[in-house]
UniProtKB/Swiss-Prot annotation:
Compartments where found: Postsynaptic cell membrane
Residue spans, topological domain Cytoplasmic: 588-635, 852-1007
InterPro entries: ANF_lig-bd_rcpt, Glu/Gly-bd, Iono_Glu_rcpt_met, Ionotropic_Glu_rcpt, Iontro_rcpt_C, Peripla_BP_I
Gene Ontology MF term list: AMPA glutamate receptor activity; identical protein binding; PDZ domain binding; scaffold protein binding; transmitter-gated monoatomic ion channel activity involved in regulation of postsynaptic membrane potential
Membrane topology of this protein: Multi-pass membrane protein
Region span, Interaction with AP4M1: 921-991
Site (Essential for dimerization): 76
Tissue specificity comment: Expressed at high levels in the cerebellar Purkinje cell layer, almost absent in the forebrain.
Role description: Member of the ionotropic glutamate receptor family, which plays a crucial role in synaptic organization and signal transduction in the central nervous system. Although it shares structural features with ionotropic glutamate receptors, does not bind glutamate as a primary ligand. Promotes synaptogenesis and mediates the D-Serine-dependent long term depression signals and AMPA receptor endocytosis of cerebellar parallel fiber-Purkinje cell (PF-PC) synapses through the NRX1B-CBLN1-GRID2 triad complex.
Protein's organism: Rattus norvegicus
Protein name (database record): Glutamate receptor ionotropic, delta-2
Residue positions with a glycan: 293, 426, 713, 716
């Protein structure tokens, strides 16, 4: 190690001596390097020293050189320094600068006919972008590109296609020109790939901190999902720092797969990148052939290379850049070209050229020297160095390295393949474990029962259980395509898995962590915590959180007929009926109406109330009201009744035909705002952890999850949460409860419920998905993911979904009202109240009838005389016999015999209680009556019917018989005599011809 500085110093001093003694040599070359490329200068001087010591190439001639440093992005300075070198006299110009200055030197070299060997240099080890130097069709292009063209676009596209990536992100550092991969971006866009770009700033820690400060939890989760597939286009130092930051901040998980592409990656960088990364890592770098014989590594033909450059164990050789290697080979190529010119004796002496003078001529030997260089070729540190017709070096090889599956942190790498522009990819990037397919492989599958993902279809004693469901269908599709078989069992604790206090995992995830199962499948969601311990395939179904609620049942209200009006309104209507009835009675009492002859009605309070009620229910009334005040009152009342009854009828129809029982909970936001319905989820599940994480996040702007967490975490989660999803579903069905769970599971339950008693609400944003879990580092993850993507693109996955979640199910998922309740014929429950009112009326009327009968019999028992019964029955006869006079001037009026006219009375039409006694009781032709006058009796002549008259014995009445009938009250009015004096009234038959005049109101019956 101490010898190297001494040798390097001696070599530098020796080469520098030749630099000063330019007048003693005929070989002089100029070099222009970027001021930051000090190592290029060191290697250049080492190469000149090695060649000057090799007497077989230049024999006695020695190479002298002049080196100058410029700003790589300052074309004017580069041209100025090149002119100084040409003025000294040079055979060739070697440059290791950026593309901006290279274009200016190209124009100068073409003008002065000086061969220009350009080695493109990348800034700080950043991947190169194409320089795009203008190439003329003529043979006067004196610039030769030593480094091969940039093939990063072709290599990345081939690798990404081999891995079947459909979505990934590209990170590039601030020094990289993104236009270098424009061709790649165009091609992947045409193939339908989803590609994102992100620039990595120099301060990586600040950039990561900004991400956490500006992104919400959902955005960070989506960002983590994007980072699962990434391409890093940056220098090795930046790549190592970036990987360390994202790993420490938990932005990537063990299932990530990153590709790093850079020509400048050396062996030391590879080991460091693998050590810092997690997951799978693929490295693409430019490689150079190395002799298999260790003793020949420092020999190239007849030339011996300095051991500091060819020994892989030498620190200087380990840290050399690719541009250093090409500079050494460039000097070697020029030395061989000079040797060829000297050997052919076609040497052209150097000339001092001036770039400033207008009449300056180019070098005459420039064309010959250029052709000699282009036709020559050497085998150096970069392999074969030669030039094609376009002046470029076509020889380039890329090496593809990758980490093996199943290796732990700090794992090694192996060579997966190589790529070159001629043959393309040589090798396979797939894991060797899957090269022979999966025929004969038996996988042990762990699951959790969850409808409709995994369900037991057959359970026969002594035989393995058979399972069915959506996840089982997906697993069968993978099995049929890849050819593997599987054995399935249920997780012992029937849980999906969550981290425990001691750092271990339980449930399905725990079975994978402890390697008791190969894969796990069910309604298993992809979460960041789970991705830290197991691998996941790409999602095969989107996931969202939903809420299961019970539909509002149609309550059996026997008095639904009263529902259209509020209780207060019913009370107002009842009070209005009583008030209007009372007002009608008072108006008639103050201004009694003049009733027509023969009217049997009376305007009592009872009749007024009955009339108002009858008109209200649109059944009419019996009392005619003729006064203007009463009619005005009744007109307003009828208008009021019309509006009220119409409104009632319309509302009753709406209440009985369309049940409006809508729930107020239609979203997660509504659920979080209310406290009447308790809600919860499965304890320690992904939903539970999801709500907890968001509810306790101080940076969460939405307070919805904070409110939900307060409800779910009551009594440390034991009050409102359940241990299994089935318990939560049963709790919803038979209690006042809302179950927060996977929307897909809840939708299946709601669709297939026999009573259609459930409905679901939730968000439509699918921020996560269901995936198949595998052991960390499993070789089956990528092949499973690729097949899942194929199922989704072909539409087969949608067919499987429709099998378990049909579009037209028997139940409506999202309506809080049963479809059967929305319309249809009315049932007995709808009108039960009407029947109850009718039954109450019937029972009440029967009770009143019994009471009236009892009262009548009790009253009749106090007048046991049969004659008194006849008097009571004859009261109705007196009302219909027009034989009483109300004239106040004749209290004891005597009636003539000719005026006696008993109106025939149709006895058959009278009710039993009012019918006359048998005609045989009146054989003595005398009618026994009482001496009272009923109130308001009218003078109306009636005629007895023939049947009634046939029962009487008509005889000649020689004289008119009289008897006491009426009494004058002390006040001059008539009143019923308190003493019912029995008197005989002789019956006087009416001639036959006079029967048709019985209805004459002017005639009466003489008594």
């Amino acid at each position: 190690m101490e010898v190297f500085p001494l040798l390097f110093f001696l070599s530098f001093w020796w080469s520098r001596t030749w630099d000063l003694a330019t007048s003693d040599s005929i070989i002089h070359i100029g070099a222009i390097f970027d001021e930051s490329a000090k190592k290029d200068d060191e290697v250049f001087r080492t190469a000149v020293g090695d060649l000057n010591q090799n007497e077989e190439i230049l024999q006695t001639e020695k190479i002298t050189f002049s080196v100058t440093f410029v700003d790589g992005n300052n074309p004017f300075q580069a041209v100025q320094e090149a002119c100084e070198l040409m003025n000294q006299g040079i055979l060739a110009l070697v440059s290791s600068i950026g593309c901006t200055s290279a274009g200016s030197l190209q124009s100068l070299a073409d003008a002065m006919h000086i061969p220009h060997l350009f080695i493109q240099r990348s800034t700080a080890g950043t991947p190169r972008s194409g320089c795009g130097l203008t190439r003329s069709n003529r043979n006067d292009d004196y610039t030769l590109s030593v480094r091969p063209p940039v093939y990063l676009n072709e290599v990345i596209l081939r690798v990404v296609t081999e891995y079947a990536w459909q979505k990934f992100i590209i990170f590039y550092d601030s020094e990289y020109d993104i236009r270098g991969i424009q061709e790649f971006l165009d091609k992947v866009s045409q193939q339908g790939m989803d590609v994102a770009l992100q620039k990595v700033e120099n301060n990586i820690n600040k950039m990561i901190t900004t991400l956490f400060d500006t992104m919400r939890i959902e955005e960070l989760n989506r960002y983590r999902d994007t980072l699962r597939r990434a391409i890093l286009v940056m220098n090795p130092a930046t790549a190592k720092s970036f990987i360390s930051e994202v790993v420490e901040t938990n932005l990537v998980a063990f299932d990530c797969h990153w590709i790093i592409i850079n020509e400048e990656i050396n062996d030391v960088d590879v080991q460091e990148l693998v050590r810092r990364s997690i997951g799978r890592l693929t490295i693409i770098r430019q490689t150079f052939p190395v002799p298999q014989n260790i003793s020949q590594r420092c020999f190239r033909g007849n030339h011996r290379i300095s051991s500091t450059l060819c020994d892989p164990k030498d620190p200087f050789a380990q840290n050399m850049e690719i541009s250093n290697l090409y500079i050494y080979d460039t000097v070697l190529l020029l030395a061989n070209a000079f040797h060829k010119k000297l050997e052919d004796r076609k040497w052209h002496s150097m000339a001092s050229l001036s770039c400033i003078r207008k009449n300056s001529k180019p070098w005459q030997g420039g064309r010959s020297m250029l052709e000699t260089i282009k036709k020559g070729g050497v085998n150096g540190l970069t392999g074969d160095l030669e030039f094609g017709e376009n002046g470029g070096n076509p020889n380039v090889h890329f090496e593809i390295l990758g980490t093996n599956y199943g290796e732990e942190l700090g794992r090694g790498v192996r060579k997966l393949g190589c790529w070159n522009p001629v043959t393309g990819l040589n090798g396979s990037l797939t894991d060797k474990k899957l090269e022979n397919n999966m025929r004969g492989v038996v996988l042990r599958v762990v699951t959790v029962l969850e409808e409709p993902f995994v369900m037991v279809s057959e359970n026969v004693l002594g035989k393995p259980k058979k399972y069915q469901g959506f996840s089982i269908d997906v697993l069968d599709a993978l099995s049929n395509y890849l050819g593997f078989n599987y054995e399935i069992y249920v997780a012992p604790d029937h849980k999906y898995g969550s981290p425990q206090e001691d750092g271990t995992w339980n449930g399905l995830v725990g079975e994978l962590v402890f390697k008791r199962a190969d894969i796990g499948i069910s309604a298993l969601t992809i979460t960041p915590d789970r991705e830290n311990v197991v691998d996941f395939t790409t999602r095969y179904m989107d996931y969202s959180v939903g809420v299961l609620l019970r539909r509002a049942e149609k309550t059996v209200d026997m008095f639904a007929c009263l529902a259209p009006f509020d209780l207060s309104l019913w009370a107002c209507i009842a009070g209005t009926v009583l008030l209007v009835g009372l007002l009608v009675y008072l108006l008639n009492w103050l201004n009694p109406p003049r009733l027509q002859m023969g009217s049997m009605t009376s305007t009592t309070l009872y009749n007024s109330m009955w009339f108002v009620y009858g008109s209200f229910v649109q059944q009419g009334g019996e009392v005619p009201y003729t006064t203007l005040a009463t009619r005005m009152m009744m007109g307003a009342w009828w208008l009021f009744a019309l509006i009220v009854i119409s409104s009632y009828t319309a509302n009753l129809a709406a209440f009985l035909t369309i049940t409006r029982i809508e729930s107020s909970i239609q979203s997660l936001q509504d659920l979080s705002k209310q406290t009447d319905i308790p809600y919860g989820t499965v304890l320690d599940s992904a939903v539970y952890q999801h709500v907890r994480m968001k509810g306790l996040n101080p940076f969460e702007r939405d307070s919805m999850y904070s409110q939900m967490w307060r409800m779910i975490n009551r009594s440390n989660g034991s009050e409102n949460n359940v241990l299994e999803s089935q318990a939560g579903i049963q709790k919803v069905k038979y209690g006042n409860y809302a179950f927060v769970w996977d929307a897909a599971v809840l939708e299946y339950v709601a669709i297939n419920d026999p009573d259609c008693s459930f409905y679901t609400v939730g968000n439509t944003v699918a921020d996560r998905g269901y995936g198949i879990a595998l052991q960390h580092g499993s070789p089956y993850r990528d092949v499973f993911s690729q097949r899942i993507l194929e199922l989704q693109q072909s539409g087969d996955m949608d067919i499987l979904k429709h099998k378990w979640w049909p579009k037209n199910g028997q139940c409506d998922l999202y309506s809080s009202v049963d479809a059967k309740q929305k319309g249809g014929a009315l049932d007995i429950k709808s009108l039960a109240g009407v029947f109850c009112i009718l039954a109450a009326g019937i029972v009440l009327s029967c009770l009143i009838a019994v009471l009236e009968t009892w009262w009548s019999r009790r009253k009749g028992s106090r007048v046991p005389s049969k004659e008194d019964d006849k008097e009571i029955d004859l009261e109705h006869l007196h009302r219909r016999v027009n034989s009483l006079c109300t004239d106040d001037d004749s209290p004891h009026k005597q009636f003539s015999t000719s005026s006696i006219d008993l109106t025939p009375l149709d006895i058959d039409t009278l009710p039993t209680r009012q019918a006359l006694e048998q005609i045989s009781d009146f054989r003595n032709t005398h009618i026994t009556t009482t001496t009272f006058i009923p109130e308001q009796i009218q003078t109306l002549s009636r005629t007895l019917s023939a049947k009634a008259a046939s029962g009487f014995t008509f005889g000649s009445v020689p004289e008119h018989r009289t008897g006491p009938f009426r009494h004058r009250a002390p006040n001059g009015g008539f009143f019923r005599s308190p003493i019912k004096t029995m008197s005989s009234i002789p019956y006087q038959p009416t001639p036959t011809l006079g029967l048709n005049l019985g209805n004459d109101p002017d005639r009466g019956t003489s008594i």
